[in-house]
């Protein structure tokens, strides 16, 4: 008999996927989610919120949530992909949806190819150049509705996707690609928040589905109130024009109401994030009490949080970490300048995809120059006051209130200038109260 012992390998215990537990269903809690969604759907219908296609989108999303909720966890994302692709055909039509999917598969094929990363980037730049030519010339035999949707899907998120892909170890996943780019609300909302790829993937069922979905319901409700307020302000401002009111009154109301119309953007962003939450994606807040900002930099952090995070990740941090050895203040100022300049040109790029033409105007240049200059001043002030103990008391609260009022008033004036077609038109408005 052999005395050699046979050593069996010890099997490692499998790590349980906590997301499966977080996707556990509950009839009562499901009903508590479905009831407010039904009320929101009724509100959309009664008040004709947005365009007719929005109601169709909401029906698809809410019905999709009702089905996805009861599916086993492993089937949830495949179902969402099928729902999103089918929704493209329903909302955009056969030709546009088919071309979008074909473009997506072409892009993924390049990304997934085994060639060096720099050559993949070069191929994607070539695809971009062809699309830019098609958008600018209109000579391709494709529907004109294709280009704005294609741009809204890929123009910014592709930058983040490639950045994260370069820094990850594994290959690109087709499932991750489709869930990230073919987001159902994006077919309707062309002005879309720049969702971070890592945040999007990391947030998938990172908390209990009922908690995340309830947050989504709340954000959809908040976005709905923003859109209703936007409609009210938009309709109201036309009543305050000379000779019905004094010129000074008309100018003041128009300036304030023009700034308040940003409620439409924040309302749409809240609804988009809320819809994603229904399917388990724990999305961060898109906007946070931006009318209560105490400075320009505070406003930058609050007004479009996803864009701020996008710029910090792609522009600010790379510049900051390269320059910080030459001085922290210098690194922060240069990083801020690069962020403002990049934001300006990316807004021009966005306008091209949505409208089909480049927009360089004196209003835009002045807006971003003034905003950037004040942001640099704020960076310097924050740097000099860093480390000081925070103060409290009534004088501090009064000063903070004054800062909020001053920031709001200044941004309202600057926003009215930015919204005018030209400086001549803006000066005429300030003089006459008419625009």
Where are these regions (language model features)?
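Membrane-embedded transmembrane alpha-helical bundles that form the catalytic cores
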Residues: 2-435
């Amino acid at each position: 008999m052999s005395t050699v012992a046979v050593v069996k390998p010890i099997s490692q215990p499998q790590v349980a996927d906590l997301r499966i537990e977080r996707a556990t269903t509950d009839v009562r809690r499901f009903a508590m989610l479905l009831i407010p969604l039904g009320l929101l759907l009724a509100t959309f219908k009664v008040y004709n919120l947005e365009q007719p296609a929005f109601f169709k989108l909401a029906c698809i999303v809410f019905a999709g949530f009702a089905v996805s909720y009861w599916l086993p966890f492993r089937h949830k994302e495949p179902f969402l992909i099928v729902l999103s692709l089918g929704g493209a055909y329903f909302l955009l039509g056969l030709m546009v949806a088919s071309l979008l999917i074909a473009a997506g598969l072409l892009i993924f094929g390049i990304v997934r190819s085994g060639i060096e990363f720099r050559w993949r980037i070069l191929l994607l730049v070539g695809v971009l150049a062809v699309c830019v030519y098609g958008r600018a010339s209109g000579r391709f035999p494709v529907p004109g509705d294709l280009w704005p949707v294609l741009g809204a899907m890929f123009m910014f998120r592709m930058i983040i996707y490639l950045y994260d892909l370069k820094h990850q170890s594994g290959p690109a996943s087709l499932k991750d690609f489709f869930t990230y780019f073919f987001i159902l609300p994006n077919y309707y909302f062309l002005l879309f928040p720049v969702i971070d790829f890592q945040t999007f993937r990391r947030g998938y069922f990172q908390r209990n589905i009922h908690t995340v979905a309830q947050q989504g319901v709340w954000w959809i409700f908040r976005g709905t109130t923003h859109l209703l307020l936007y409609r009210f302000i938009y309709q109201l401002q036309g009543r305050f024009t000379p000779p019905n009111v004094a010129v000074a009154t008309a100018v003041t109301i128009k300036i304030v109401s023009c700034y308040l119309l940003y409620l439409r953007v924040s309302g749409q962003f809240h609804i988009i994030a809320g819809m994603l939450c229904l399917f388990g994606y724990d999305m961060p807040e898109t906007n946070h009490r931006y009318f209560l900002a105490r400075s320009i930099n505070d406003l930058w952090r609050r007004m479009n949080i996803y864009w701020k995070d996008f710029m910090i990740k792609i522009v600010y941090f790379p510049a900051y970490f390269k320059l910080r050895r030459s001085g922290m203040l210098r690194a922060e100022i240069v990083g801020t300048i690069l962020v403002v300049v990049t934001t300006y040109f990316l807004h021009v790029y966005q306008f091209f995809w949505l409208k089909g033409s480049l927009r360089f105007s004196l209003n835009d240049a002045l807006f971003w120059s003034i905003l950037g200059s004040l942001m640099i001043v704020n960076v310097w002030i924050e740097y000099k006051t860093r480390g000081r103990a925070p103060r409290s008391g009534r004088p501090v609260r009064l000063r903070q209130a004054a800062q909020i009022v001053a920031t709001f008033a200044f941004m309202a004036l600057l926003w009215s200038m930015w919204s005018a077609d030209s400086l001549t038109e803006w000066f005429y408005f300030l003089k006459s109260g008419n625009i």
